[in-house]
Amino acid sequence: PKNYDPKKKYPFILSLHGFTSNGRGQAGFFPLADLAEKYGFLYCFPSGLDRSWNATNACCDYAKKHDDSAYLRSLILWAQKEYSIDKKKVYVTGLSNGGFMSYRMAQDHADLITAIVPFAGVGFKNWPKQPKNPLSVLHIHGTKDSTIKWKGGSIIARAYPSAEENFENWRRFNKCDKAVDASKEKIDLARRVSGKETTITRFTNKDGTVTTELWKVSGGGHVTPPTAEARERIIKWMFAQSK
């Protein structure tokens, strides 16, 4: 924010682009500058080598196996060294391939990350390992996504889970067994779909410190730019999560 004060501690958001895109493209999909001024946080839109992230076996760094997990961890650590960041409030979000990479970061670096918000990107079909620590997840997915399908599918014969299967995986990882009624919290998330098309499924762990949440965007496609209302609500959701 323009009034950045090194004596204060700020939340930090790492926002990851999709396959063939870059940081500038992600900033267009999920703008943060206005919200950073309003809520006081720091953010970064990095660009992956070859316009992709090596997230899972299904998506998406096919040509060269860059260690993007280690790179992004080092980027977060660098930001914490150079800027006044609250280490209890470090968040990763991303679209499509960036959503896959958000899950990879949660798996590999749960010690560093507070919560993730993936759009239209899931994790492994069969997880090679579980996160070391539970961390909150907000998964956002359109039912008419023809690229990363709501019901799951495969990319070059490499399977990825459905949105609901992926949600269940993380609900179990996080030991979120307590259902929270969110039926009245419908959201107008998709600018290209009329009305409040997004419904919420929410579970928490027994003491309410970890949340696993699914936003089902009925009629939403793969690239569904969120409304200003939805962007703000996502930021508020992030900042409600803390280590």
Language-model features: where?
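Proline/glycine-enriched tight loop/beta-turn segments at coil->beta junctions
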Residues: K2-F12, K132-P134, V210
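Conserved alpha/beta-hydrolase "acid-adjacent" motif
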Residues: S146-K151, I155-S162, P225-T227
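Acidic beta-to-alpha connecting loop that harbors the catalytic carboxylate
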Residues: G48, T143-S146, G153-S154, S218-G221
